[in-house]
């Protein structure tokens, strides 16, 4: 079977809710990542077969095929470039990578951009469902769903609390994990570890035009006492805003190519895609599926967890990567080495390609060979992607 290669991977620096990227339309934010990956890779825009854009809240400014709109807003992509927008919840753009790789491995396409965008400031999380319910246009929970899951609330927060109880984590475990995320993100920023992946975004500020290049959510002065003092989201629970991923604006992109296209273009890949896995499980606890998806990915790849040099496990809530570590026995020093979504933000549909950008560049910088990325996703789904650095 033909191989699929990652040639380049980029992301914008994250913007806080109502922060430095809040003034940028998500279509233009996505176009920025598309243009950057064309410029940095040197790929001929005319050779791009498709753009697959992940986006969760596909309403308002992210409605009407945001992926295609981003292509049309791009400075560098011709209007003849096709695009599609997909929603696999938080794993949307990781699934975009997998669809891109599958297209290349099937031989039906040679050059595909997987990308993602989410402006959580301008299109708030859950707003698409809330709008329709407010207007009397119905609820996504059908009679059939209610029959199978009577009275169940589909809640990430409840799922996170269920993981805390199931795995016996103390609140202090969550707080310490969150502190480490900020500390690693601060160290990565100060050492310019993100320089190879971050693309500048032109913004307007009260001081005039600027370029946004630094992740806005990192608490450079984070302390355990400060994190521990944040109010609980539920009086009976353990999760706080400080141990949850940050609402974030951002976009990201990954260029996937076939070996045939690499030879024709003379471009050099960063990594080879080694395994593509997606599984689904309990939709109520919801966020635990990365544990079992990782088991399946390693089994199918014929690998053990110790063979993986770096892991990117999305920090939707602190108990998710903590449960993943406990289940897999992975070395915690290899996990989210530059921090995660607790510090850097979780721009929903953009997080999959964002994490891949961090993973492939970290593998290159650290001389690692294999990297594994996984994310929990709404509905109890999880993607796993294993890559080999080249």
Language-model features: where?
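Conserved active-site "lid/cap" helical segment
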Residues: 1-74, 85, 162-171, 181, ...
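N-terminal extracellular/periplasmic Venus flytrap/periplasmic-binding protein-like
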Residues: 10-12, 23-27, 31-32, 40, ...
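Conserved catalytic cysteine-centered active-site region
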Residues: 55-110, 150-155, 221-246, 327-354, ...
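Flexible glycine-/small-residue-enriched beta->alpha junction loops
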Residues: 111-163
């Amino acid at each position: 079977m033909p191989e699929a290669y990652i040639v380049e991977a980029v992301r914008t620096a994250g913007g806080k809710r109502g922060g430095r990227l809040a003034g940028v339309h998500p279509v233009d934010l996505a176009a920025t990542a598309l243009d950057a990956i064309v410029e940095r890779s040197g790929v001929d825009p005319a050779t791009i077969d498709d753009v697959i854009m992940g986006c969760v809240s596909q309403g308002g400014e992210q409605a009407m095929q945001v992926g295609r709109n981003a292509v049309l807003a791009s400075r560098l992509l011709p209007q003849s470039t096709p695009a599609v927008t997909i929603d696999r919840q938080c794993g949307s753009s990781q699934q975009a990578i997998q669809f891109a790789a599958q297209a290349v491995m099937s031989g039906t396409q040679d050059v595909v951009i997987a990308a993602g965008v989410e402006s959580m400031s301008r299109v708030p999380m859950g707003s698409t469902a809330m709008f329709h319910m407010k207007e009397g246009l119905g609820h996504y929970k059908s009679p059939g769903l209610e029959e199978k899951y009577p009275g169940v609330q589909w809640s990430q927060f409840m799922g996170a609390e269920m993981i805390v109880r199931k795995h016996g984590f103390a609140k202090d475990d969550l707080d310490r994990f969150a502190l480490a995320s900020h500390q690693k993100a601060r160290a990565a920023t100060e050492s310019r570890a993100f320089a190879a992946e971050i693309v500048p975004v032109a913004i307007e500020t009260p001081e005039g035009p600027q370029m946004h290049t630094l992740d806005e959510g990192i608490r450079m002065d984070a302390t355990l006492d400060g994190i521990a003092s944040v109010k609980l989201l539920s009086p009976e629970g353990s999760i706080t805003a400080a141990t949850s991923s940050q609402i974030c604006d951002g976009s990201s992109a990954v260029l996937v190519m076939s070996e045939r296209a690499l030879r024709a273009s003379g471009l050099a890949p960063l990594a080879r895609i080694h395994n593509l896995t997606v599984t689904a499980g309990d939709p109520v606890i919801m966020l635990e599926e990365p544990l079992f998806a990782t088991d399946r990915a390693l089994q199918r790849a014929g690998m053990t967890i110790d063979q993986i040099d770096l892991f990117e496990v999305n920090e939707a809530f602190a108990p998710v990567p903590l449960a993943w570590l406990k289940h897999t026995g992975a070395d915690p020093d290899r996990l989210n080495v530059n921090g995660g979504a607790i510090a850097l933000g979780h721009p929903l549909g953009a997080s999959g390609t964002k994490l891949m950008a961090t993973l492939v560049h970290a593998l290159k910088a650290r001389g690692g060979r294999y990297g594994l990325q996984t994310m929990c996703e709404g509905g109890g789904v999880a993607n796993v992607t294993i890559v080999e650095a080249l």
